[in-house]
């Protein structure tokens, strides 16, 4: 897709360019093809609610594919508000049975609203520090909560720290009580995005997600700006603000905060995605990758989305970027961004939802980015991971269902609207009339 240049220039100088490219994906080997469809993850038990009841209400707040050491297989976890109270619950999926609620350890509850803040999306990070796979969930309202396949432990600053099966002591003075973002770096769990302390980045003790005391090696790092997102890339943990980017490195067993740039930042928290050995994010000037050069510690930031700049500017100016969901399709070297617009009546139907699809493709002997538009996919959260050797791309919707992308040739039974429009073809002469014939 190239929405930034005029038709005559595209016709003469960029054969194969499209002026409209809706629901087409660029191929790694060149050219375009219509995207595949999506369907309910389970045709019978698609809605995240206990089978035969209405325990769930509202949108799916989060979805994850967890490598569960206890069951010995991957577990799909979805999160949704309770229908009968103001809390939300975690559900796990079982084939042929549907969704079942987890019972949280120590009678923990997860309020939807607390301290004038409301849960809108739940993010997660998985890790294994040597004692099995764990997954940590954050929502920006409640304490982070860690699941090890057996029990759930909330990480609170008022706790003494450490893991105990019978008591919830996880946490310590350096923990953040309402983080919105989470990731893992150098065998530490990192939390940030706490509304009350927006510049704070907290990390656990080494190889211990349950201990957040200074004596054990936990700590906090002030970013110097409101943190939008944190994301590890190679030997650095990048810290994104709206106007600046910094990185955390390790020196002499200490975390060091260094400047990357003070001229650009990230304007959509969930746009930060790692794909094909790079880190991509949405800035006011478009999609930017952080690409490491041959010199250690030297990073180059350059826009890869100039051909669709006008399309992106329209999205940035007119859409709520907090609704943006991003997901990577690794097998296709693709990243997909979904935007769910609203009006005075609330969330719009799927047919009104837009997005951007980007992929790497062979071009001119090298690999470059190509982009297109998405239309007709409404998301409230997204994730992708492997179940066995198969990549599974999931998204939750505002209707409370979990869907699987790359499934079928329709949008859950509806036709896929697709458009591929070329520039006007003048065959090298704009003023000469032509006669077109076909065989």
Q: Where are the predicted features?
A:
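Beta-sheet repeat architectures centered on beta-propellers
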Residues: 1-135, 264-278, 285-439
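Short loop/turn positions that demarcate and connect the beta-strands within blades
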Residues: 57, 176, 222-225, 266-267
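Carboxylate/His-rich catalytic cores and anion/metal-binding grooves
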Residues: 177-209
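Asp-box/WD-like beta-propeller blade repeats and closely related beta-sheet repeat scaffolds
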Residues: 149-181
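Short loop/turn segments that connect beta-strands within beta-propeller blades
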Residues: 94-97, 148-150, 250-253, 293-294
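Surface-exposed extracellular loop regions of Gram-negative outer-membrane beta-barrel proteins
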Residues: 88-90, 237-261
């Amino acid at each position: 897709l190239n929405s930034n240049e005029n038709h005559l220039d595209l016709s003469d100088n960029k054969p194969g360019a499209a002026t409209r490219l809706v629901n087409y994906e660029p191929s790694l080997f060149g050219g375009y093809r219509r995207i595949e469809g999506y369907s309910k993850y389970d045709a019978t038990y698609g809605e995240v609610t206990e089978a035969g009841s209405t325990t769930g209400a509202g949108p799916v707040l989060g979805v994850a594919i967890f490598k569960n050491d206890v069951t010995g297989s991957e577990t799909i976890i979805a999160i949704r508000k309770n229908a009968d109270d103001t809390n939300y619950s975690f559900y796990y999926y079982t084939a042929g049975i549907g969704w079942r609620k987890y019972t949280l350890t120590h009678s923990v509850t997860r309020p939807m609203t607390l301290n004038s803040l409301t849960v809108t999306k739940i993010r997660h990070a998985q890790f294994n520090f040597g004692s099995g796979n764990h997954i940590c969930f954050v929502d920006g309202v409640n304490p982070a909560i860690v699941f090890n396949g057996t029990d759930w432990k909330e990480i609170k600053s008022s706790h003494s720290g450490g893991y105990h099966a019978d008591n919830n002591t996880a946490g310590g003075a350096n923990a953040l009580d309402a983080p919105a973002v989470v990731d893992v770096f150098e065998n530490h769990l990192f939390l940030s995005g706490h509304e009350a302390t927006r510049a704070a980045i907290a990390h656990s003790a080494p190889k211990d997600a349950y201990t957040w005391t200074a004596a054990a090696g936990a700590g906090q790092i002030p970013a110097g700006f409101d943190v939008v997102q944190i994301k590890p890339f190679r030997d650095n943990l990048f810290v994104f603000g709206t106007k600046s980017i910094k990185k955390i490195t390790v020196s002499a067993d200490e975390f060091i905060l260094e400047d990357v740039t003070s001229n650009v930042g990230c304007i959509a928290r969930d746009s930060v995605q790692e794909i094909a050995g790079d880190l991509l994010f949405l800035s006011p000037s478009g999609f930017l990758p952080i690409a490491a050069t041959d010199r250690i510690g030297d990073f180059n930031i350059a826009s890869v989305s100039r051909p669709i700049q006008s399309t992106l500017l329209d999205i940035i100016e007119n859409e709520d970027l907090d609704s943006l969901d991003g997901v990577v399709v690794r097998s296709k070297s693709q990243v997909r961004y979904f935007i769910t617009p609203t009006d005075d009546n609330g969330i719009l139907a799927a047919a009104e939802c837009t997005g951007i699809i980007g992929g790497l493709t062979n071009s001119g002997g090298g690999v470059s980015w190509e982009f297109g538009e998405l239309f007709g996919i409404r998301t409230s959260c997204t994730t992708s991971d492997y179940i066995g050797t198969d990549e599974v791309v999931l998204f939750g919707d505002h209707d409370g269902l979990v869907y699987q992308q790359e499934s079928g040739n329709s949008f859950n039974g509806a036709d896929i609207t697709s458009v591929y429009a070329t520039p006007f073809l003048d065959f090298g002469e704009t003023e000469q009339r032509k006669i077109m014939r076909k065989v």
